[in-house]
Regions:
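Peripheral, non-catalytic segments that deliver or gate enzyme domains
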Residues: 1-177
Length: 177
C-alpha cells in the first residue's frame, strides 16, 4: 500500500466491493431503482467512474447479485440468487476475462449452490439431489465433471466450508430440518 486516499466517489452501490488481486481494479455492485444490487461493474483505479465497465447484469427481477473472491485468490465469483435458487459466474485475474464471466452451472428452480476454489479444484456447496446439502468438486479445467466429495447425510445439514493451508473446515447440524 502506498497510503494514498482514493477520492474516486462511486455512488449508488450496495457496499459490496471486491479489490482485484493486482490492486488495479475495484469490482462493485450497483443498485437499481428499487435499491437492489443487480449489476456488477469494474472500476480501474485512477480513471473516471463514468468509464467503468459493466461486467454482469442480472435480468431477472427476483434475483440480486454480488461479487467476491476465492480462497486461493485465483478467481472471482459473481453470485446471483433469490430465496431458493442461485447461480454463479466466475472469471480469473486476466483483465480480458473480466468482461465475459463464465457461467458455472445454469440456474435451476429450487437449487442453491455456491462455489469456492482451492488446490486446483472448484468446490461446490449445493442442495442439488441433496435436501440437506452436500459438497462436490471438479477440476478447474473440467467444470462439467463434478463429483461428490462429501455426500448428503440423513438428518445432517451440511453448512458452509472454508479452507486452511491443508484443511477444509465445514459446519454440520445434526437433526436438521
Amino acid at each position: 500500500s502506498d497510503n494514498k486516499i482514493i477520492d474516486e466517489e462511486i455512488k449508488d452501490t450496495s457496499g459490496n466491493i471486491t479489490w482485484s488481486y493486482n490492486d488495479k481494479f475495484l469490482f462493485y455492485s450497483k443498485l437499481d431503482q428499487f435499491h437492489r444490487p443487480r449489476k456488477i461493474y469494474c472500476h480501474e483505479i485512477g480513471t473516471q467512474v463514468k468509464n467503468d465497465k459493466l461486467i454482469f447484469e442480472e435480468k431477472d427481477e427476483r434475483f440480486t447479485c454480488g461479487i467476491g473472491t476465492s480462497a486461493d485468490e485465483k478467481f472471482y465469483f459473481i453470485s446471483t440468487s433469490e430465496h431458493t435458487t442461485s447461480e454463479v459466474y466466475f472469471f480469473n485475474d486476466d483483465e480480458n476475462s473480466f468482461l465475459k464471466p463464465t457461467l458455472f452451472i445454469k440456474r435451476e428452480e429450487g437449487i442453491e449452490y455456491s462455489v469456492d476454489s482451492w488446490n486446483g479444484f472448484f468446490w461446490i456447496h449445493t442442495n442439488k439431489d441433496a435436501k440437506d446439502f452436500k459438497i462436490s468438486r471438479c477440476k478447474h479445467n473440467d467444470i462439467k465433471n463434478i463429483s461428490d466429495f462429501i455426500p448428503s447425510k440423513k438428518d445432517i445439514m451440511i453448512g458452509g466450508f472454508t479452507f486452511l493451508d491443508k484443511w477444509m473446515i465445514r459446519s454440520e447440524k445434526n437433526n436438521a430440518l
